[in-house]
Swiss-Prot record:
Limits of the 4Fe-4S ferredoxin-type domain: 3-31, 34-64
Cofactor annotation: [4Fe-4S] cluster
UniProt protein name: Ferredoxin-2
PROSITE patterns: 4FE4S_FER_1, 4FE4S_FER_2
GO molecular function: 4 iron, 4 sulfur cluster binding; electron transfer activity; iron ion binding
Organism: Nitratidesulfovibrio vulgaris (strain DSM 19637 / Miyazaki F)
């Protein structure tokens, strides 16, 4: 099974830590209300750092 990067936008508190740590994989929404995954199939090495530092734990890998 393949895995993909998931971010729960309803839980996101828009702290921007994932965007700062891993701009290859995350960006802020146009309104700045939450972060977004740029590419769910990313292989960026910084993703694990973003997952572990998210204060509301809303980023995870999911199985397809």
């Amino acid at each position: 099974m393949a895995k993909y990067l998931y971010l729960d936008q309803d839980e996101c508190m828009a702290c921007e830590s994932c965007v700062e740590l891993c701009p290859e994989a995350f960006r802020m929404s146009s309104a700045g209300e939450y972060a977004e995954v740029i590419d769910p199939n990313t292989t960026a090495e910084c993703v694990e750092d973003a997952i572990s530092t998210c204060p509301v734990e809303c980023i995870e890998w999911r199985e397809e």
